[in-house]
Each structure stands twice: as structure tokens, then as C-alpha cells.
């Protein structure tokens, strides 16, 4: 066949099975396995019911490629079955690699600094002196044009409000009320109780 010229790295297929009977009924499982045993006799199956997937492990990559070419997108018990090559992940070590040291160290030095670690100086705060100067020049009752009008945009004008006399008076009255002592609440005397049977 034409595909035997290629060098395949994968010897496992992942089958996406829509029919859930493959995972529970032994007869359906035997039918499913017989489809692939024609391509390789030393084949093993791993069933993942919750994912609706079956991993099929072949003894060589050519058998896996042949099975995929013949059975991909074919019907199995009335539903389409899709086959994909399983991706193998090669990790150099059996241990997890430590995370990259990016952004692990703050400005203060860590307890055991790594090789090449240097102290970073704090940046000076950015102060906009032009803005502070403009704010200091603002006075109450005046208007300031921030942006002149053009043919397509309106002008932006700031009106600085004067403090309202009425508001100040209300605030003073409120302060006086708070300073006054609270009036004493005299409790009313409870009326005399005379039982009905005695009257």
C-alpha cells in the first residue's frame, strides 16, 4: 500500500465512540474489538467510559495507520466512529519540573536568592507638576477653557463653582444641633392595675 513508505511515530489510536453500549455490554465490545483485530493480533484496548473514548494500542505504527485509513468516519452500530492518532508526550524526567522563576521575587531580596539575582531599585513616583500648577491657579467664579473648539469638536470649559452660603449655614446649624445636649426623656408612669374581679 502507498502509506507504507511513511515513517509513523504513533502506534496508538483514540476512537471517539458515540454508542455507549461499547462500555457496558460485552457482546458490543467484542464486535468493536473484532474490527481492529484484523489489522493486528497483539492489540490492547483501554476504555474510558466518562470520555466516550477507547484507546487502541497496536504493536507497530503501520498497523495503526492502516486501521485509521480503513475505519475512520465509518459507522459502528448506526453511529459514526472517528479515529485519531494518540499524541505521545515525552517528558525527560519522571518528576514535575519546577515553575519558571519569573515574577517570583519582589524588590526585597529572597531568603536564598538565585544565581544572578540583583536588587531592583524603586522607581521614583511620577508627579505631574503642570497639572498641580494649573489646579493651583484655579479660582472660584472663573471659567477655564481646557480645549479650544474646532470645526468637528466642541470646546471643553471648566466652571469653578463658588461655595454656597446656604450650604455653609446648614452645615453650621447641623453642628450646633449635634453639640446641644439631648433632651431627657421622662418615662410615663404605668397606670394602676386593678383586677376586674375585685372592682
Curated annotation (Swiss-Prot):
Modified residues (Phosphoserine): 108, 112, 163
GO BP, sorted A to Z: calcineurin-NFAT signaling cascade; calcium-mediated signaling; locomotion involved in locomotory behavior; negative regulation of calcineurin-NFAT signaling cascade; negative regulation of smooth muscle cell differentiation; response to estrogen; response to ischemia; response to mechanical stimulus
Region described as Disordered: spans on this chain: 162-199
UniProtKB keywords: Phosphoprotein
Single GO molecular function: calcium-dependent protein serine/threonine phosphatase regulator activity
Top-level taxon of the source organism: Eukaryota
Modification(s) after translation: Phosphorylation increases its ability to inhibit calcineurin and decreases protein half-life.
This protein's GO CC annotations: cytoplasm; nucleus
Function: Inhibits calcineurin-dependent transcriptional responses by binding to the catalytic domain of calcineurin A. Could play a role during central nervous system development.
Assembly, per entry: Interacts with RAF1, PPP3R1 and PPP3CA.
Protein name (database record): Calcipressin-1
